[in-house]
Amino acid sequence: MKNPRQLIAFFLLLVGCAFEKKMNQKNEYYSEKFRPQFHFTPERNWMNDPNGMVFLDGEYHLFYQHYPDGNVWGPMHWGHAVSTDLVTWKHLPIALYPDRLGMIFSGSAAIDVNNTSGFGSPEKPAMVALFTQHLMEGEKAGKHDFQTQGVAFSLDRGRTWKMYDSNPVIKNPGKHDFRDPKVFWHEPTKQWKMILAVKDHVELYGSPDLKNWNYLSSFGADMGAHGGVWECPDLFEMNVTGSEQKKWVMLVSINPGAPNGGSGTQYFIGHFDGQQFRPENKDNLWIDYGKDNYAGVTWSNVNDGRRLFLGWMSNWQYATVVPTTVWRSAMTVSRELKLEETGVGLRVTSFPVKELKELRNDSTTTSNFLKNESNSSEEIKLEGKAHEIELTILKSKNEATFEIQFTNDKQEFIGIGVDSLNRLYIDRTKSGGEFSKDFAGKHYGKLNSTSDTLKLRLLLDASSIEVFADDGAVMTELFFPTEQFNKMLVKSNKGVSIPELKIYTLNSIWQKEDN
């Protein structure tokens, strides 16, 4: 028998090595090249659509499409994280695993406060998840009914889950794309409603108990964009800012068919009577004109009246080949949606949640940053990966143009500007995109105003830019330069001035996780 002291010393050495390895992993996992510093990312491996977004007992729950065994798409699980402020996140164990009915595709969650399902009690309501189950064997066999809708519930704030014994709650009637249920309570009819994506349209269902569902109506086969399959719908009521009017808004993601190619999210404004949705808008409207905001939906059960949104910050054209290593994909920042009358009509507008300002650290303010002179150019050095920039642009003539470039010593850059046609754009032709022919390009969006004054708020992270205009327009795009951007360059022709520019460095949301 070996000396007991030697055995104890050997055991302590093993424990110490394991602890050091774990700490090194934690110290490194948020600091790899391209790892976002204030956007949610999985600790490891693949992530796509946000799912099951619901608020309960002070926590915002984010479930998400996740493959825990690789950094490309694979058998889908529901990953899980929670936040108390929509900014910093705590990773939790995987919530839902594939079972005999298939992989766990996208869906939603609701709090059954009236215990209509019988899963909980009025004192302890269940968190109920509804999701698509995708049976790969059925798809490979050439069948059309391989996607069904299932239910699971939790009685401990989403920490553990039980599958409903009588799944599926909606069987497939023979439709190839039949997925992504979003569920909400409709008080006027005292029923749960479900909006479901079905190839090139959505279908609406009703239920008294989240378990027994009846078909109500369909929408969209002859409306909206139809360049690809409809996915990840959402339906909710909103107040029109500054009035007593209320409208219903429907979000529908589409892939491909977005304005700048690949994936994107369109929306419709109209009325919903509990049975049918009737749109008012005739034009195709988009939540975000950038290339990298897809499958976004909103949180349920939020207690402060805000309509809060989160999207997957990628595009199916290249999501599986972007040059990240340990993990793949990030979410957008959490956003507040508003319904507002603009210079071009009633629009859904987007703004970063107010809580994001808590990340602000050092700041610099420059007055009269750019004067109304011919072919002006100004440069500022940047330190760190995460920044927020606020600036006001004054245009003294219609054809005035400007461009803000974030660049490095290798002349790589991503550019943000407004052209002579008053189009907002992001230019990432030289931002590092050799991994995909669909990545590089100059991509255009629409502003909701023709005013001579434009306020911009730019959120720059290690590999993404989110551009918010004061009229609520937004563009989101990724970039992957060989070296970190370390300078900001502003160029303009005559007719543009910038009376004030503010730059904030932002703290990393993973610093607390490291501790």
Where in this protein do the model-derived segments appear?
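Beta-rich accessory regions
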Residues: G242, H271-D283, I287-N515
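Alpha-helical transmembrane segments and their juxtamembrane interfaces
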Residues: L12-G16, G138, F480
